[in-house]
Amino acid sequence: MPISSTEQQLLVFIMLLAGVSAIAWLIMSRLMRIAPSASLRFSVANMLLIAGISILFFRQPDANLVFWQGSDLLILLAFVALKAGFLALFKRPSAIKADIILLLVWSILALQVPDNAKEHWLGLLFSAFAFISLGSSTVILYQASASSFKRRYAVGVAAPLAGISLLFLLRFVSSLVIAPHSMAAVHQGKSELYWAYLVFVLLVNITIFSSTLVRLVAKIRHLADRDQLTGLYNRFALNRKLAQLQQLHSRGRCGGEVKCTRCRAV
């Protein structure tokens, strides 16, 4: 299939965007030392996206199964690195073992795909794993943001990644419903796919930047809430903690009243 100039321009722009992002996060990790562990993972995620999309650009429908798996595996590894970056950024326990197990399951299932329908079934498996990985990253990002800010701000931070996850879920469901030969006709052109990856790379790096900003602001707020010499909380921090304690106390009292009512009924 001949490669159009539009596809070439889209690929160059994607490579430029992901490459600049990878270099920027690497500088933040090594030189500026801003969240070094998380920034390094974000840089690796962008590098893996560059490699995976580059292989995807030269992939043809008649390519062998290993070539198909190579591009998908690199992009899925980018999703794993992205999730690991969020976990490191917000000081959460690592989930690399679970991600490796899922990747092994994906690889085993992908090897069982017949050659005459590899585009359909590999796309279905790719969408399923992408939804699981990005969906869990969305949950991590929302929970970490909601612990420091109001829920509407946490929703705004996690919304781009949640939208991407839902798109992969929609693709998975459509792959189940539409016949394999129809899906091949739908994905015959690559321009739409490159536009999707361009938006994806842009939204992912915006989400990474916003999550890093959330973590930075939360850390500054935590340092500002307490006096570094005496360890005492300031007036605003005390008011927030008193409100939280009052809310917990009211919940416990309501729970106790419900239990007492049930006991009396018995």
Predicted regions located by residue number:
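Conserved nucleotide-binding and Mg2+-coordinating catalytic segments in signaling enzymes
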Residues: 221-243, 258-266
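Short aromatic-rich membrane-water interface segments that cap or initiate transmembrane helices
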Residues: 187-197
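Hydrophobic transmembrane alpha-helical segments in integral membrane proteins
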Residues: 1-20
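Juxtamembrane segments at transmembrane-helix boundaries
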Residues: 19-39, 51-184, 191, 207, ...
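Cell-envelope/extracellular polymer assembly enzymes that use nucleotide-activated donors
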Residues: 254
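Hydrophobic alpha-helical transmembrane segments
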Residues: 195-208
